[in-house]
C-alpha cells in the first residue's frame, strides 16, 4: 500500500458501502418461485466484524428496496442499513450528523454511476475491479477484486493495516 493510501485510511472512522456490485456480484438470481436471491461473500462479513471490534462502523447503502439487504445488514451487525436511497449525497450529510463524523473520515465503496457523486465527497473512495470506468477514473483505490468476491474485506484490512491494528479476533 502506498503512503498516500495509508494516510487516507488512517483517518477512517466509518465505512459506507453500496451493496449490489460490491457486497454481491451484481447478478440477479431468481428461484423457481420467482423469489429474488443475492449471493454475499462471508469474507466481507468478517471485515465488518474486524472493523467493529476496532470501533469503525459500517453502513450499507443501496438504491434498491430489499428485504434481503436488510437481513444481511442485521446478520453482519452493521451500524445502519439504508435502502431505497435515490440521492446518496443527501444521505451522506445525514450520516455525518448521526455518526458524528466528517466526510474525510468516511470510506465509500461503490461500483456504478449512482455512486459517482458520493465517491467525490468522502475521504477514501474505492471501486471494485469490475466497477465502471468512470469510477476507476476518480476513486482513490481500484481493487483487483471483483464485487461479491471480498472487496469489502480488502478495504477493511487496508484500513486496519494503516492504523497498525492486528487483524485477529
Question: Which residue stretches match the model-derived regions?
Answer:
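Non-catalytic pre-domain segments flanking phosphatase-related domains
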Residues: 1-17, 165-169
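Mg2+-dependent phosphoryl-transfer enzymes with acidic/Ser/Thr/Gly-rich catalytic loops
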Residues: 38, 74-75, 81, 89-169
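Asp-based phosphoryl-transfer active-site loop
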Residues: 10-28, 119, 152
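Amphipathic coiled-coil/heptad-repeat helices and related helical stalk/stem segments
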Residues: 1, 43-44, 88
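A positional/architectural concept
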Residues: 23-52
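Structural motif
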Residues: 61-63, 84, 108-109
